[in-house]
Amino acid sequence: MSAPLGYDLPLCYDLIVQQLIPGYASLARLAVALLAASPRASSSGAAVLVAGCGTGAELVEARAQRPDWQLTAIDPSAEMLAASQQRLDVESISWRQTTVEDLNADGCFAGALSVLVLQSLPDDGSKLAFLTALARSLEPGGQLVLVDLMAPERSTLQSQVEAAWMGFQQASGLKAEPHDLAPLTQGLHPIGEARLTALVNAAGFGDPARIFQALGYEGFLLQRRP
């Protein structure tokens, strides 16, 4: 992801996203806790994939909660990988500058985390390819925690929700201009829950179970079918 105008994205990404997304500060902790309680990843020394590690929020939390996990962190951005590596013990994590589609790690992981990645992919086969690759990388029965911006359902409350989101940003102290935030808020491809269900089923997962929601941002627990 390119940096917003006037910002060094890896340095300020976490602060900006906390001001944009309600509950973001707790997301990494919740995602790791959910995966740590899963049947496969609860075992000592479980192999866990962080797909799209960004600046390392999920990795930091995983190291705090489950220092025994064998972590693999992937991101197509060398800049983001470098930012993550500055926050963590580089030697204790397997780092790969790649996408999950090119990882070639079939059945290698007991669990996986993907936070704010799927939303950036168009629904032209790219979302399905991403989800299929994630399912393929998991052991049968392995779980994925997926968090993304979702398309709003038709609701008479939608305008109120949008106004609340703007109010949240202002109350959080977000000072950036809209054009500065464009890479974080525009060019995204959110989908509705029905479409997500169809895609994850086609990819090899069971139905998504919602485990988090804050305005338009939702988290789901997915399990690879046997």
Predicted feature descriptions by range:
Residues 1-42:
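Conserved class I S-adenosyl-L-methionine
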Residues 141-149:
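Conserved beta-strand signature within the Rossmann-like core of class I S-adenosyl-L-methionine
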Residues 47-51, 55-102:
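Class I SAM-dependent methyltransferase SAM/SAH-binding core
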Residues 116-120:
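Short catalytic micro-motifs in class I SAM-dependent methyltransferases
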Residues 149-202:
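C-terminal alpha-helical "lid/dimerization" subdomain adjacent to the S-adenosyl-L-methionine
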Residues 113:
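A conserved beta-strand element that flanks and buttresses the S-adenosyl-L-methionine
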Residues 128-140:
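A short glycine-rich, Lys/Arg-flanked "PGG" loop and its adjoining helix->strand segment in the class I
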Residues 197, 203-226:
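Core SAM-dependent methyltransferase catalytic element
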